[in-house]
Amino acid sequence: ITTNAQVDVGSGYAMGFKAGAEPVDMEPHHFHPTGAAFPPAARGRLVTEGVRGEGGILYNKNGERFMQRYNPKLTDLAGRDEVARSIATEILEGRGTEHDAVYLDVSFLPARIIEERLPTMLDDFLDIGVDIRNEPMEVTPTAHHVMGGLRINNRAETNVEGLFAAGEVTGGVHGGNRLGGNALA
């Protein structure tokens, strides 16, 4: 599952590589921990970190708040990489839903809070027949971002004279665990 459109095929990387630009950190890929898994029309839709930030809880098919097992201090607010690995472990060890997912639930929050603080998520899920005010979302780690790209210096220059790179095609900027909201920084 990926959050990326089918037309996102790495053209920027390919153009740079073909011109002789040096790649860096191409092996790490960021998996967003909460991509929609079900219903099928939702697969790959990114479920914003704001859902957990507003108090959303993760639990497996057995109703267990499993993040307490992996990070008892931060639980559902642990870092994205840790949450993604924890969800994957739950699924691989047989505690995921029938759709290879876990539940992310905000239905215990007052409807007004969901409507005011998570309006996009509410609308996105209503469009596919899930009312997050009354039922949980099914989420799974979802391919989201390549951590590497073209190596640049502090002036956005690659090793190819006259070739500059910016945004998601650059590498050596994020490290192994990209911070939220800086994909185009």
Regions found by a protein language model. Give the residues of each.
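A glycine-rich dinucleotide-binding beta-alpha-beta segment and adjacent secondary-structure elements
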Residues: 117-170
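A conserved FAD-binding loop/helix module that cradles the flavin
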Residues: 1-19, 160, 172-185
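Short helix/loop capping segments that flank catalytic or ligand/cofactor-binding pockets
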Residues: 66-69, 113-114, 156, 160-161, ...
